Amino acid sequence: LMLAYNSSSLAGLLTNTKEAVPESRWGLFFEPNFIVGNRSTTVNRTGYGFTTAGFTMGADYRVWDNLLVGLATGYNYTDAGFNGSGGLVQNNSWPITAYAAYLPETFYIFGSLGYTLNLFDLQRTIAFGGITRNAKSSPTGNQLNAYGEAGYDLKLKPLVVTPTMSLAYTSFGLQGFT
């Protein structure tokens, strides 16, 4: 489910009329997410389960007819654990991303630069002989992302083929813990 808005009035969302409404240079979006997964334990592997929930929202502005700039942020919560005493991890993450798109007639260029703060809670049960202990930690993670993409429209009537090229960079650092 993605909700987006790019108009000068919310009234157009409530009717089926096709009235000409001047288009706003501002756009807003909101996208919730929810993912659940698991894998059963077998002879060769430990099973696990996870849940992720959150949202992304943002706004962009059309500077010119072919130039768009924007800012997006959000929140995600992840809870994952291994079956048995394999441990668990919980993560609260807050991303922020700036982006721009140049969209002339036959090609486009898109780029983004982002940062995500990750706050982890980790737990693992350690059993040795008759002694059982829980190891716990709450490290912080910092993530930087950069992305660039370009594409060109090849108009092959009646088709339009758009070859693209992209480059992505991600750096993740996790605070030390004992």
PLM features: residue spans?
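Outer membrane beta-barrel translocator domains of Type V secretion systems
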Residues: 1-161
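Aromatic-anchored, glycine/proline-accented short structural segments
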Residues: 159-178
